[in-house]
Curated annotation (Swiss-Prot):
Name the record gives this protein: Orotidine 5'-phosphate decarboxylase
Organism: Thermobifida fusca (strain YX)
Molecular function GO labels: orotidine-5'-phosphate decarboxylase activity
Keywords: Decarboxylase, Lyase, Pyrimidine biosynthesis
Subunit relationships: Homodimer.
Length: 233
């Protein structure tokens, strides 16, 4: 079984993204297309990275606008059949609900607090207190509005799982194999720790895509997770 990893295809062009996708797809469950690549190439990039593969598509657009606009955006990409589409939980319950209703076949994944933000950064934008408090509030709000998936730091995964129960898919960015550079992520954990905390899907980008051989890097990580019992066999 493919490892529960969404490889972030944050490539400079569609050709590179397609090459990475072909290399890693045999080893991981999901391919993630982000905002930059989608804005540059539109739906064509989805078809390019998906090809004839069975790998799930994660469209990470982090929609955040008034409910009607988000509903229209969600409806416009629903035809691409993404398994997941992200919206910001901070957009409010009505906005999350609008996305859910506009794309019923897609799991709307509500982003709680970006993993690039530490408590000082949160305080600067008016979100006082520990990050986990904001994550908890936003997670509950989003699930009550119909979101079937949540995006949170691995450091908050156990707390979120306890709050929302077993049926919501928990997606964790900020995942770094032991020894990998932290980069622009502030709240991180290893893949094994994230899965142990209750994560269902790990978002991993640069440790795989910036490796000399992305396919080999994905295969090695998948094998390590299976060996440690963190990933289903």
């Amino acid at each position: 079984m493919a490892a529960p990893i969404a490889v972030a295809l944050d490539a400079p062009d569609v050709e590179t993204a397609s090459r990475w996708a072909a290399a890693v797809a045999p080893h991981v469950s999901t391919l993630k297309v982000g905002l930059e690549l989608y804005l540059r190439y539109g739906p064509a990039v989805v078809e390019a990275v998906r090809g004839a593969r069975e790998t799930a598509l994660f469209l990470d657009l982090k929609l955040h606008d008034i409910p009607a606009t988000v509903a229209g955006a969600a409806r416009s990409v629903a035809g691409l059949a993404p398994a997941f589409l992200t919206v910001h939980a901070a957009g409010g319950a009505d906005m999350v609900r609008a996305a859910v209703e506009a794309a019923p076949e897609t799991r709307i994944a509500a982003v709680t607090v970006l993993t690039s933000l530490d408590e000082a950064a949160l305080g600067a934008v008016g979100m006082r207190g520990p990050a986990r408090d904001a994550v908890r509030r936003l997670a509950v709000l989003a699930v009550e509005a119909g979101a079937r998936a949540l995006v949170c730091s691995p450091q908050e995964a156990a707390m979120v799982r306890a709050e929302v129960g077993p049926d919501v898919t928990l997606i964790t960015p900020g995942v770094r194999p032991a020894g990998a550079a932290q980069g622009d992520q502030a709240r991180v954990a290893t893949p094994e720790a994230a899965l142990a905390a209750g994560a269902d899907l790990l978002v991993i980008g640069r440790p795989i895509t910036r490796a000399p051989d992305p396919g080999a890097a994905a295969a090695a990580l998948a094998a390590e997770l299976q060996k440690t019992g963190a990933s289903p066999s």
